[in-house]
């Protein structure tokens, strides 16, 4: 009994002194516009208060300030402002604190200061030179990191909202940090993770030409492989391509936005998958026994400042206990428990049974279909400039058909193509005409062109050496006598026959045939370029010796450079050469002349990728007739051919193929036994040395032609 009275007394004392714990009262809220599109909120209390703790939310854009020990005495919870960047202010009192929520049009920075019983909140950037009360900046010690070189030391940055620089750094723990310098700290990207890539989209933000590059950061040994920056119209996109398992964090300090990608283990990835949560709403707690479901929906709507429309069929009670649960998850739990569904239109939340919502949407679709079937037909001529009108018309009919049978409009209207003017004549309802114009505007664009330049380099070096000897002689019973005539010096026998001092060749100086036998050792150098002959004569014997030598060197280089321009995904071919004729015999014995092509040709099919790289299917041939090795008057064809499919950057030169051949040979022809004798064997053999080197290289350089280059080319 006494213990029960004690607990009751403690409860009464707590109830009596609970209001005293909230020492300060918020009595007044004033708003004033400041220069530089800034807004000042002045909060007046009945006594001094401590500095608030706050945070910002990006979507929806808002600033939240927590005022500990403060009661709301304003008499209202919501107040519309519509001053500068601020839309409204919401003051919510919970337990021992009061939360001030400032709803913004776009996320902006803010500062706070306390002066006596007043708290000032300034929303917006401070003007240059203004003094803003804030904590003194602390200079952090730089952590050791590996830095990628900036793309350009001082890139040109356009005025307004723009990206100033993009850099890459490697952190201490192997994480890859993509550092983006912004011209305005209020720039906020839309971040998406799709297809294993992290994409940051900056709306109404310019990107200097110097920063529109693709960074290859594989060598930094981080999960990041590439960082690609591009711009289209007034939108800038930065795509980060990591590999393997990773986790990323995005944070911003002043004008610097950092995307940190760190590697993950398999265990971390499994844990992250389990912890992945689809609900992001502000957390709340609900604890009710047998409460009307409409009341729960009203509580959630009040908590989120949403307008609620509930169907009359939403009925029944529910018991729930939820602690620190996101409000959107709590709403889904309530709806699923009672078989309900929701539709959100702006800031209005519509709740009804799932069957009722589905039936209503089916009725709306049927009504729209009936309206479309009764819509008047209009005729319009749409000019197509670059594409084929027939292709676009066929594509339009296929994408707007129902199951490939008939059009959405039940076969009403017609699509006709005029090939002469490359135009589409459409007789369709206005809705389909608008859709046709959108398709034409997206598909009727100039085809990009590519110039392909190939270089075929042939280099050869040759060296030939030959050294040989010839022995010969003649025997005569009589005596020899000498002669000299027409520059020839030799000997003459008794019969008047002449023998010159060439091994074994006894001939008349001008006419006649040889009388002596052939040389008994004929190992002279082939195609000799020099030689020396020695003769030994007795009364009836002549002995001749001829030493001959040949040495030949040579080198050459042939460079062929074909070029061709073609459209994206179109095949082009250029050919230069000749056709070699040759005779063919038929089974009947008749002959006919045929031709074999021997030419230099380049055949390519380029494909431009979305990141301005080029996939090239290429075939390069260089055939030439070999007239030095003709057979039956027909030269063979020396063929050089390369077939490849490669991926290359715009303007980059790549070697797509090469052949190197080295031919070395050494041969010795000699007289058995005599050719093996030391020293003397040199007089009975012929040595030949050959060394030839040939190299073929094929280079390819594709370049994407812009509109200006095409105009100059014309």
UniProtKB/Swiss-Prot annotation:
Any GO CC annotation of this UniProt entry: cell outer membrane
Main subcellular location of this protein, as a coarse class: membrane
Alphabetical list of InterPro entries matching this protein: AMIN_dom, GspD/PilQ, NolW-like, NolW-like_sf, Pilus_4_PilQ, Secretin/TonB_short_N, T2SS/T3SS_dom, T2SS_GspD_CS
Record PROSITE patterns: T2SP_D
UniProtKB keywords: Cell outer membrane, Fimbrium biogenesis, Membrane, Protein transport, Signal, Transport
Signal peptide limits: 1-24
Keyword Metal-binding: no
Stretches assigned to coiled coil: none
Compartment list: Cell outer membrane
Gene3D superfamilies: 2.60.40.3470, 3.30.1370.120, 3.30.1370.130
The keyword Protein transport is annotated on this UniProt entry: yes
A GO BP entry: type IV pilus assembly
Function: Essential for the formation of pili. Involved in the biogenesis of type 4 fimbriae probably by serving as a 'porthole' allowing passage of the fimbrae through the outer membrane.
PANTHER family on file: DNA UTILIZATION PROTEIN HOFQ, PROTEIN TRANSPORT PROTEIN HOFQ
Family classification: Belongs to the bacterial secretin family. PilQ subfamily.
NCBIfam families: IV_pilus_PilQ
Protein name: Fimbrial assembly protein PilQ
Biological source species: Pseudomonas aeruginosa (strain ATCC 15692 / DSM 22644 / CIP 104116 / JCM 14847 / LMG 12228 / 1C / PRS 101 / PAO1)
